[in-house]
Amino acid sequence: MKFVVSLTFRLNGSVAENEAAAGRVLDVYSKWTPPAGMTIHQLVSRADGAGGFAVVETDNAADLIDTTSKFAPFADYEIYPVVDIADGVRVSQEAIAFRESIK
């Protein structure tokens, strides 16, 4: 199953605290590897530097917890299950046809 993960850095401290946290998260990231069962299709940073997005695929929700918990002190997460657009369009068309069949 595919997921879009949105992360927003927790910039709630003083400038010095935020700078220290930025260095720490980079140290942690440099040692991190994705869980074996998770494929990262895309990992991008926001242009404003305040977070990023990932498109990941896994059949095990624990892979998401494994990753987000390692970075939880530094970021807030929102995780959305997603489908490829062709599948989403097909299902939407089927839903419309279903509703139209009811008189």
Residue ranges of predicted features:
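Short S/T/G/P-rich N-terminal loop/turn motif that feeds into the first structured element of a domain
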Residues: 1-50, 84-85, 89-103
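Short hydrophobic/aromatic beta-strand micro-patches
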Residues: 8, 55-57
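An amphipathic, aromatic/His-enriched active-site/gating alpha helix that lines ligand/cofactor pockets
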Residues: 32, 36, 58-91
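A common structural microfeature
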Residues: 51-53, 76
